[in-house]
Design a protein with these regions (language model features):
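A short, conserved, highly charged catalytic patch centered on acidic carboxylates
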Residues: 2-114, 130-185
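Short beta-alpha junction loops
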Residues: 119-124
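Conserved blade-register residue in beta-propeller folds
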Residues: 126-128
Length: 185
């Protein structure tokens, strides 16, 4: 009798915990969608990019030595047939996604996408992928469309060093597995 009661209490606690986890996941997903919408509005209204230049949730095929996988990002801005910047939105710590955006920008094209940004809507880090440096810490420091067009004029497609390519692909692939939303949409 005591064992049955303990088992019933354990199952009830499990149910409560699972409901709480699901609720928190739904809140995080809603926050992420809010960040993505805010970034889209910023790109269009403040930065003056055209909607047709911004790819939303694009997927890229990644060929590793032993498998092939699809990886994605929130936004890619393409100018003059060149992927100019990748943008990853986060509902929590942007630091945890810095490595992903850098690896992603280095490996999804046959050249390094020159810029990457990760943001939670408040904070941001903007990276120059070729030099490896941080060039901005706010979404407001992101290039406006005309500045981006000026930068792309002299852009030379530089592939990532082949001896480091597999490692970067594996980093992008590993992050892809952990970024899936936990809540079914």
């Amino acid at each position: 009798m005591i064992n049955e009661r303990n088992e019933a209490q354990r199952k009830e606690r499990e149910k409560i915990v699972m409901e709480k986890v699901k609720e928190e996941e739904m809140i995080a997903q809603a926050q992420l969608e809010g960040v993505k919408e805010w970034v889209w509005d910023l790109l269009i209204t403040e930065k003056k990019f055209r909607p047709e230049e911004i790819k939303i949730d694009p997927q890229f095929s990644l060929k590793l030595s032993d498998c092939e996988a699809m990886v994605g990002i929130d936004y890619v801005i393409n100018l003059n047939s060149i992927s100019f910047i990748v943008i990853k939105c986060s509902s929590s710590s942007i630091e945890s996604w810095e490595r992903y955006v850098k690896a992603f920008a280095r490996v999804v094209q046959n050249y390094q996408i020159p810029y990457a940004m990760v943001t939670d809507g408040e904070n941001a880090k903007i990276f120059d992928i070729i030099s490896g440096s941080v060039i901005g810490i706010s979404v407001h420091e992101l290039f406006k469309r005309q500045e981006a067009l000026d930068k792309i004029k002299d852009f030379i497609k530089i592939p990532f060093p082949p001896e480091k390519l597999e490692r970067e692909k594996r980093i992008a692939y590993a992050f892809e597995g952990i970024k899936c939303p936990a809540v079914k949409q």
